[in-house]
Structures are given as C-alpha cells and as structure tokens.
Amino acid sequence: MSILEKVQPIETMLPERYYTMSTEDMEKRVREIKEKMGETLFIPGHHYQKDEVVQFSDAAGDSLQLAQVAASNKKAKYIVFCGVHFMAETADMLTTDDQIVILPDMRAGCSMADMADIEQTERAWKELTKLFGDTMIPLTYVNSTAAIKAFCGRNGGATVTSSNAKQMVSWAFTQKERLVFLPDQHLGRNTTYDLGIPLDKMAVWDPYTDSLEYEGDIEEIQVILWKGHCSVHQNFTVKNIENVRKNQPDMNIIVHPECCYEVVAASDYAGSTKYIIDMIEAAPSGSKWAIGTEMNLVNRIIQQHPDKEIVSLNPFMCPCLTMNRIDLPHLLWALETIEKGEEINVISVDKQVTEEAVLALNRMLERV
C-alpha cells in the first residue's frame, strides 16, 4: 500500500457470508440500499467492468469521464468507484474533502500504472536530465498513480487520455524540445508517430535497468517512452489481424491505441474506448467488426448491437483481471458497510500530492 494513501479498512477480506448469498439476494440488497441512500450515494462504473456491476452504475465511461462526473456531483456523500485504484485516486483528488471515495476491492489495481513508481520516475528524470538538460516535459497517461501525476504537475507537465493524447502531445512540444511519456509506451509511440515523429527519433527508458534504448542519433531523440504497457492490449497481435484478414476479409478491424505500434498500423481504425463505442454505434446494420480491446466491453458491445457481426480480434482474449476484482459481492459489501455507518477501503490521497496532481490534470482540462 502506498504511503500516499490513508486507508481505513474495517475488514481486509470479503466476509464469508457474501460467498454464500445468491445473485438474486445480492442484487435485491444493492437495489434496496441505492433506493434508501438516494442522491447521497453515487456509483460510477468503468466500461471494462462486469455486467453484474455495471447494471448498478449511475454513470458509465472511461476513467477520466467518471472522475469528472463524480466531481460534478456535489450531492453524493459516498462515491463507490467501480474501477481500479488509480481511477478512484483521481476521483478523490477531484471531489470535495467531505465526499468519501470507496473502492470495493483494494486488490483492483492496474499493472500498467504500477509499471511506473515515483522512485523509478525521479531516478529516470535525474539521469535523463544529465543527457538532455532542461529540454524535457513529462506527460503521463491518466492510467497512472497519483504520485506520477503529481510528478508531472510539479515539472510543468500534464496528463493525457487516449482521446486527447494528440492535442496534449502537440501542446507539450510548444513547451519543450523533448517529451517524456509514461507509463504506456504504446500510446506514446502511436500518438507521436501519428503526429509525424519518426520511430528513429524515439527512445525507450527501461526503469529496471536504468538505461535508454534507442537506434538513431541520441541528439535527435524527441520522444522518450517509458517501458510500460497494458497487459490486456499487449495480447493483441499482428497474427490476430492476419487471421481475420484471411478468414473474413470484409471485416473492419478497430483497436485501442494501447495496442502495440505494429497492431495499430495493421488495423483499419484505432482510437479510445469512446471512439470504439461511437464507431460501432454509427456503423450500418450488417457491418462486420473485429475489436481489439478489453473483453467485458467487447461482449457488451456485441449484446448492444445484434444487427452487426462483432467479434474480439483475439478469440482467446481474457477480461482485465484486476478490473474484474470488482464484482457484485464486493460492491454489496461496500454498500452494506456504508449503510451500517462504517467505511471500508477509503481512498484518500495526500494533500500535497493532490495539489500537484491536480495541476497536471487541469493543464489538460484547460486545453481539451
């Protein structure tokens, strides 16, 4: 657990009785508590959540959308965030001090966010400054810890989403000659390449060996990518695309930019979760789509569009395992403890970290 968080769990593990309750009984109790608490309770649910959880969300969206919606809701005392840890952190930083953000299962982390910790990042910045001097600006994907957002805030940088990455990267290059992009190398590479920066002007910082990997002239490096990735989107391959092209050549292929450069380059379309949802929504009836993103979302899109032929780009894809930590039993547990006047798994980010992280968030929000 990060020292930047102050968590007050009543119990650290889900009580046994929730394992023996029927789905019907759990759903009934959630509805009862939601009705009883009314506007004092707000449940945001990420697109990648299970249907058993999403059915109770008061808003569905990507991580930043949900944090903003939570921040605009001044009536809710309790925000039970159905997503992963960094999302709940962002919600806590953007909401008021008297609003309480709860994560139903503290094990719901994000492997990509965990690939850049603050000690590694501070060390990397020091080493890169020796190489490049005061020519760099940091940008972090919102899929990062509060500490990394704060690092970017105090070093003149900002956050980005997969929807606005191009705008924010363009802005960053008006501030400095070089960009340090973390923690997702793939989103950084795909975005900067789309903006015209060649691959040989990009380097990768490996935080485990404290080394810079590059092929071109070091003096010409414009982008330094953190060696991190999404464990879900990493599993989509060019071979998957080749199989679809061979077996169903009339199928459109659309992927998330967290996929690697080779997969994005071989696809027909690439964009954020919202972009993918909107594209399928607007597509004509009878159209065919292979989607390269998280499986819970793909399955939901399939259910919502029976008039279209939709498959996962990778037929053996699994849902995001950490996102799947949030399930109906954990949601009910969180709600019942609130009902009893208790609080579990409260997310509370350190005040100074919040101030610096909000700087980075606001630099983005002011420009998009």
Swiss-Prot record:
EC number: 2.5.1.72
UniProt pathway: Cofactor biosynthesis; NAD(+) biosynthesis; quinolinate from iminoaspartate: step 1/1
SUPFAM superfamilies: NadA-like (SSF142754)
Record's keyword annotation contains Cell membrane: no
Positions with a binding annotation for [4Fe-4S] cluster: C110, C230, C320
Any GO BP: 'de novo' NAD biosynthetic process from L-aspartate
Annotated residues for binding of iminosuccinate: H46, S63, Y141, V142, N143, S162, H256, P257, E258, T273
Annotated localization: Cytoplasm
Cofactor: binding comment: Binds 1 [4Fe-4S] cluster per subunit.
Keyword Lipid metabolism: no
Annotated GO MF terms: 4 iron, 4 sulfur cluster binding; metal ion binding; quinolinate synthetase A activity
Reaction catalysis annotation: iminosuccinate + dihydroxyacetone phosphate = quinolinate + phosphate + 2 H2O + H(+)
EC top class, as a word: transferase
Signal peptide from the UniProt entry: none
Cofactor(s) annotated in UniProt: [4Fe-4S] cluster
Top-level taxon in the UniProt lineage: Bacteria
Record-level GO cellular component terms: cytosol
InterPro entries in the record: NadA, NadA_sf, Quinolinate_synth_A_type3
Key words, A-Z: 4Fe-4S, Cytoplasm, Iron, Iron-sulfur, Metal-binding, Pyridine nucleotide biosynthesis, Transferase
Biological role: Catalyzes the condensation of iminoaspartate with dihydroxyacetone phosphate to form quinolinate.
Family note: Belongs to the quinolinate synthase family. Type 3 subfamily.
Record protein name field: Quinolinate synthase
Organism: Bacillus cereus (strain ATCC 10987 / NRS 248)
Lineage of producing organism: Bacteria, Bacillati, Bacillota, Bacilli, Bacillales
